[in-house]
Structures are given as structure tokens and as C-alpha cells.
Amino acid sequence: METLSRYMIYLENEKYLPDDANSILSISRNVLREYHIIIRDVRVASYFLELDMSISPFDLEKVKSKLTQVGSVIEIDRIVEIELDKKISLNLARQLFNNEKFWKTHEVLEGVWKHTQGDERSLLNGIILVAAALVHYQKGEHAICISIMKRALDKLHGSSGLYYDVDVDVLKTNVKNIVNSTEISKFEI
């Protein structure tokens, strides 16, 4: 049996909303039914659809071609774990977050989080939870998103000011607004 590699495949989003994630997942699985693949999730961002897949590298071009039935492929990112310098990781996580790549934000920040302790660890856990909450929003899981945002607020409670280039006070305000209104909106960190 072939070894599968994990990829994030990004398709252009011309019309979909987060509530469409399950139907896009079904369509994608149907379009790719003849291939030995795993499609874990579909997440819907403003400008792209993010398909979390495991594929044989040998089938990648065929899968890419088939996925044009769902949307134009704009990026393919093979997922590999790498250790980065803390400052580089935090900068990358911020860029990913601001580009609505919340799953990858979560992954990059976890790499930093596991090497921290105390207040910094709690702060990073809060930011990771915000990213995780927004992953659920992109899957159309609004109630789960709000629930995780509440947990994030608990972790962020004791923090303020700037953490590298992240304004923690602005982050907390955005999260509080979402929790209080239960209206999920895009924001940057």
C-alpha cells in the first residue's frame, strides 16, 4: 500500500460560506472517490477553501485536476513538522492567522507553546484556542466556536499589552465581542 502524505489544498472560494463546509466535503469526496485518499476536513475562509487531505504524492497531480470540479486550485502545501526559532514562529503564526489559515496557526503556535511555561504558556494557549475556535467556525460549527472562545478568554485573562507583535488587549476585546454577541466575525492579530 502506498504511503500517504498530508497536504492542505487551497481552492479559490467564489461563493461558499462556512455553513457549506459539510456539503463541500461530500462533493470533494465524491469527485475523488476513485483515489486512495483521506479527506479529513474542509474549512471555508473568505477567499479560499482549505481541504485537509492525505494523498499519495504520485496521485497529487490527478487529484489537483479532479478538484477543479470544486474550485480552482490556488495552493498546495505539504504538511511537515519543522522546528523554527520562536520569533520566526510567532511572526509566521500571526501572518497565517491574518490570512485565515487558522489550522496552521494552531500548529505553528503549538510548537512554541510546548517550550514555554507560566503566564506565557497560558497566553499562548489562549491564542491557540482562538485559532482552534475559528477552525470550527470555518467548518460551520458556530456553537463549538463560541464555546472554545470562552475557554480562550479564560486563558487570556491575566495577559495584556504586546506579546511580540500581537496586541493582547485588542485580541481580548475581539474575542469578548464575539462571545458576548455570538456573532463570529473576522479580525486580525
Regions found by a protein language model. Name each.
Residues 1-99, 103, 159-189:
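N-terminal alpha-helical interaction modules that lie
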Residues 142-160:
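TPR/TPR-like (Sel1-like) alpha-helical repeat modules
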Residues 85, 118, 122-125:
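Residues that mark the junctions of alpha-helical repeat units in TPR/alpha-solenoid scaffolds
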Residues 97, 102, 109-110, 149-150, ...:
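Inward-facing hydrophobic residues that define packing positions of alpha-helical scaffold repeats
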Residues 117-120, 158-162:
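Short coil/turn linkers that connect adjacent helices within long alpha-helical scaffolds
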